[in-house]
């Protein structure tokens, strides 16, 4: 599933423990929206998405 298909408000996208994006799903940069995620989980009220 691609990241752009997520419909949640607060999201953090990480790659190798480095944060690539943190904010609202609607504001994700186009290059990240097309990436597929490896792992997704909740941390508090935020959704954490890990990519390769």
What are these regions (language model features)?
Residues 1-4, 24:
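Short, structural beta-strand-to-alpha-helix junction motif
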């Amino acid at each position: 599933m691609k990241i752009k298909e997520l419909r949640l408000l607060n999201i953090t996208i990480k790659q190798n423990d480095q944060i690539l994006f943190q904010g609202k799903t609607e504001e994700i940069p186009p290059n990240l929206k097309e990436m597929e995620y490896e792992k997704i989980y909740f941390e508090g009220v935020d959704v954490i998405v890990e990519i390769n």
